[in-house]
Amino acid sequence: VSKIKPTDEPHQAAVRAAGGIVRRPLAGRSRIGQWLRPRYEIVLVHRPRYDDWSLPKGKPDGDERDEDTALREVEEETGLRCALGAPVGETRYEDSRGRDKVVRYWLMEPPEGARAAPFVPNREVDEVRWLQPDAAVTLLTYPHDRELLQGLSRRGPRRP
């Protein structure tokens, strides 16, 4: 007699998503040996559907690679076409539908002159803000996003 109880629901793989920690330098604040300190600003997005502040991210289109998903989602949500940098880490949490979700993040930087490019609100994101890391941590809605950014501030990006 088997002691394994069958479940009514099939096993679901975690929901995959990818995004970016987009940074831009602040003029005149650079110091050798520091990575993510007040000399940089980080972009956060406000999503009206959830009334939350988060890092730009989203789900893949079909079999899209995570790196490509991250770049596309950052551009869709912020209007910034960025260069992909080092992997930063991942967050794991339960989404609003009770599913496990894993989001992989990469460091990204917009091209020179992106500061002057105007953001155009859309149905997913109605506001973006550039903030120094400490202020960004304070504004982020979710603990997993705050922990990721705080860890990055302490250690810098992961080495491949």
Located regions from the model:
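Short, acidic/hydrophobic/Gly-rich beta-strand patch recurrent on exposed beta strands
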Residues: 43-46
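Extracellular/periplasmic catalytic domains that process cell-envelope and extracellular macromolecules
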Residues: 36-37, 99
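A short gly/proline-enriched turn/hairpin at secondary-structure junctions
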Residues: 54-56
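Acidic, metal-coordinating catalytic segment for phosphate/diphosphate chemistry
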Residues: 1-34
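Unchanged
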Residues: 58-147, 151
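Short, charged, intrinsically disordered terminal tails
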Residues: 154-160
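Conserved beta-strand and immediately adjacent loop positions that scaffold enzyme active sites
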Residues: 19, 41, 127
